[in-house]
Amino acid sequence: MSPIQPDLVDVWIFRTRADRPPTAGEPIEILLLRRAKDDAILPGLWQGVSGGLDDGENAGAAALRELAEETGFGPHQIECFYHLDQVNQFLEPGLAGVVTAAVFAVRVAPGAEPVLSGEHDAMRWVSPEEALEVAVWPDYRESIRRILENLLDPERAAWFELKLNGERVRP
């Protein structure tokens, strides 16, 4: 098997309001980050974490590195790391081809707060409903829906969970 290496990773961050794993129907908050207004790429866009892979880096490692770089969240704040079984593809104007992004999600501890990098100039924790309204790209909305459908039920979430080294957690 020759896996295709994605160009980018997207990481969606959520937290519960209680100090326990989420359950279906329980309120969660999703972190939205606004790209800096002076950024060359999509200034002012509300998004999750997004970034490229370094040479020789796998997608899971890139997701955790980008998460730390853009929010300061590391192993002590991460409660669970998930793949969303989603690879987005889009045509970026000015590039000669299609760009792919592997999509991940991270549940951080209740009360955890990001420390923003210069890439973003604002952040806000919002309800999933507000995140769906604010998300510009259809793939962003699909990622949010996958969090709601797959990661709030502990039995189902176990199938998507990864160790921090990128290996699957076996349910």
Identify the function of each model-found stretch:
Residues P27, A68, G72-A112:
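Active-site segment of metal-dependent pyrophosphate-handling enzymes
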Residues Y140-P171:
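Charged phosphate-binding loop/patch that engages nucleotide di/tri-phosphates or the phosphate backbone
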Residues V103-A105, P114-I147:
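NUDIX/MutT-family hydrolases
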Residues M1-L31:
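Conserved N-terminal beta-strand and adjoining loop/helix that marks the start
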Residues Q47, V98, W125:
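Short aromatic/basic micro-patch
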Residues G25-E69:
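Conserved Nudix-box catalytic region and its N-terminal flanking loop in Nudix hydrolases
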